[in-house]
Amino acid sequence: MRKNYDNIQIIRGDITTAKVDCIVNAANSWLIPGGGVDHAIHQAAGPELAIAVKKFRHCDPGNAVITPGFNLKATSVIHAVGPIWNKSENTEEHEQVLSKTYQSIYELATKHAIQSIAIPNISTGVYDFPKDLAAEIVWQTTLAFLNTSQSKMKIFFYCFDAENYNLYTRFLQKLKS
């Protein structure tokens, strides 16, 4: 039986304005405000977000934690830590960690009964993960989640740049054809 993937959308835009239950933050292991989407989410949520993540102290790559959304339209934020790509290291391990990152997102979202979620491109910015490989891993992990769960969660992939947007759009078009 073919699954209906109409609950997945690809959006090129500002994730901080997403009207969803939860926004995913591409966080660093120390959970302190950093650059890129992490900076934008902390700015939009207000100083309470930085205080809320302090209680966790640390989050290993592949894992995630959840906090309230504070000044965001979203009621919660999942802070997910992706791998830092280094092609001189074990790249297969990096791939497994990126997959685990998205698994952690979906597990937390399910645990907290999140009905709609906005997810950025994790690790493909300053963490330098190859965008095409990351997109493939994201889709494999997302499809595994959707095909094995009863979730009706709406998933919005927010892409900041054209390359990620085009990669994600192609994957979704293939899926729906």
Question: What do these predicted regions represent?
Answer:
Residues M1-H112:
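Glycine-/small-residue-enriched capping loops at alpha/beta junctions
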Residues W85-S177:
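Phosphate/ribose-phosphate-bearing ligand recognition and processing surfaces
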